[in-house]
Amino acid sequence: CAKTFIPNHPKTKLLVEDINKVKAKQVPFIDILAGGFPCQPFSVAGHRKGFEDDRGGLFFQIIRLIEELEQDKRKPKVIFLENVKNMYTHDNGKTYLKMKSELEQKGYHIVKKILNTCEYGNIPQNRERLYIIGFLDENVKNRFKWPEKIKLTNTIENVINWSGEGIDKKYFYNESSKCWDLLNEAMTQKHSIYQFRRVYVRENKSGVCPTLTANMGMGGHNVPLIRDDN
């Protein structure tokens, strides 16, 4: 995460630290506290243990920071949180309501919405996420408007490095790879996305990549595959 963030935000001070150990005094003056926490405890792809998972409990570290900043008279005016859409319905909605209640107890007025990257970011990937925003000032909350959808103009065709140059060879299948014969036979079209579904290969004809997840780096089924120019 840090390796990606730093080149894109070279002027931003990045504190790489265990959130459990970060104290308010390490945080500069801020108007907006943007927080994310591991989605696996709430995700369909995970075991959905929610707050019973240590990673799910990291939400309460955000609450702790808010409390410490408030004690220092630097309480953020806005709280901005993001997670998988399934968090909204996790445990019959109790997880979301618990988080909403915790934020409201800190004085925040809450709005929430599920947005898809391909409809708002002009990125050809289906990535639905739940966004939760809390405002200290209720008047600001009432004036807030979610962004309008934008037309998707970027396509898989123009965002993927089809040459394969500069990409680690470990991400490529070859004749010695397991399931090579099946993949080679099924993946006939270049510049298209395929998914290996354990026993068959499906071509994704929507032109939009399915959600990329953290565990895809470990291989397995459902990982998007392409046939590059080589």
Model feature map: region roles:
Residues C1-N8, W146, S176, T188, ...:
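Short intrinsically disordered, low-complexity coil segments enriched in acidic
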Residues G217-G219:
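Short, charged/polar surface micro-motifs in flexible loops or helix N-caps
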Residues V16, A34, F80-L81:
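Generic enzyme active-site microenvironment
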Residues C1-K21:
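SAM cofactor-binding core of SAM-dependent methyltransferases
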Residues V22-I30, F42-T211, N215:
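Class I S-adenosyl-L-methionine
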Residues N222-N230:
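Short, surface-exposed loop/helix-turn segments at secondary-structure junctions
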Residues P38:
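Short glycine-/small-residue-rich Rossmann-like dinucleotide-binding loops
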Residues K13-L15, R74-K75, H221:
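Secondary-structure boundary/capping residues
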